Amino acid sequence: ASDVYKRQIYMSTYKDKDGDWLDGGVNYVLHLPPDVPAESFWSMTLYDVDTRCIIGNEQHIADRSSRMDLVVNEDGSVDLYFGPDAPASKEANWIPTVAGKAWFPYFRLYSPGKAFFDKTWVLPDIEKA
């Protein structure tokens, strides 16, 4: 395998699919298609726009990853949830946000696979839930 596959890829955004700034008072979902091309693992971590530090919340949860016991859809896809309200029966896939606090995510691929580079797997936009 090429040395490039031993690296990490970081993807980020400050806006949702509609072009609106990510807002801690709004609930969002990110639908990860099946077979995320990460030979080691993938992770999603949220950060505070003002401090650029890991997002603070009462639950002390700032990330989710493929190394966790997430709820996986029948087709192998995973829905990640961000917002002040936990999604019913999918709390394992939720990263809480705080109203009044802007945030941004880093989605990381550790040992990214070929499907990322040839764009046969594409990370969708975050959408309002």
What are these regions (language model features)?
Residues 28, 42, 78:
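Residue-level detector of short, conserved catalytic/binding motifs and their immediate flanks
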Residues 32-36:
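Non-cytosolic beta-sheet module surface loops
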Residues 15-31:
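Contiguous beta-strand segments within globular domains
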Residues 41-59, 66:
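Extended low-complexity, serine/threonine- and proline-enriched intrinsically disordered segments
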Residues 62-129:
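TerminUS-proximal long segments
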Residues 6-17:
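Short beta-strands within extracellular/lumenal beta-sheet-rich domains
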Residues 24, 38-40:
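Short loop/turn segments at connectors of secondary-structure elements within structured domains
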Residues 1-5:
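Short, small-residue-biased leader/transition segments that mark boundaries at the very start
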